[in-house]
Amino acid sequence: MLNTFAAVVRRWHTDNLCHWKENHTGRIMRYLETDFFPLIEETPIAELRVRDIKAVIDSVAARGVVKTAEKIRQWINSICNYATMLEIIDGNPAAPLAGYLKKTDTAHMPTLPREELTGFYRRLLLADTEPQHRIGIMLLMLVFARNKELCGAQWCEFDLKQKQWLIPAERMKRPRAHLVPLADWTMELLAELLIITGHGDFLFPSRTATGGYISENTFGKIINGMGYKGIATSHGFRSLASSSVLNEQGFDENAIERQLAHVEDNKIKAAYNRAEYWPHRVAFMQWYAGYLRGHYEQARTLNGEVTDKAT
């Protein structure tokens, strides 16, 4: 039997199930299947090189999730050690990457300058991509969510009547459920997306992983392909909203921080009110949606678009 990377991963995963919590086991496979398998799933693990592992880690870190990239590096290192122990490979190709990401751990991800918003929307409308992915990038700009939170979103998390999205605790960076108010434009985009993917569980279902969702690299690759590599990242949309626009408009700083799910552990360990500052959050999310839509409409005019839809 050929010892492909995927085969060794599944063997390693099975042998370690007894040592992990259930949610941890699922998270490991989900990350590896979405970020690593598409590139080297069928590659014999003996042919895996440092550059192959580094390329995957770099692509994950480029989304602004350096800690996730480091976790993936650690898992790959463990998998390669496991393969070495079983004498499937002679040495661990992940070993030289120990400490590789430390130098970028505090680096700020590139943020799209607000002066470029109209141009960004113009390129997005012209991009050769699937309609649901175009809508996904537009939603990411509107809801202040982290990339992985939107990529893995399920329709059951949305209360469209109440115009709310409740992200469950297990999908948040910190284990606390997070509530997102949905502006009018956000609702319109979700209505378009519902027609495309509403028949399944996920807003952005995977074409390759049955019952799964798209790779967290998807939106970043589209943005890079639009010519914004090194200029803008999907994670940077959060900074664009909070630092570049909303704070300058005088919106409540605490409300903005809460909407970004920036909560200090020492302040809210005993009780966490996910609806705190809710009226403020609803107001500035609606205002910001209008601000972005203004740039979007300018882009449509420049492109000669005649439809109101993102598709």
Walk through the language-model features, giving the residues of each.
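Hydrophobic (often cysteine-bearing) scaffold residues that line and stabilize catalytic clefts
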Residues: 5, 9, 21-24, 28, ...
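C-terminal catalytic core of tyrosine-transesterase DNA break-rejoin enzymes
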Residues: 85, 138, 142-149, 218, ...
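Catalytic-site neighborhood detector that most strongly recognizes the C-terminal catalytic loop/helix
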Residues: 103, 111, 166-175, 187, ...
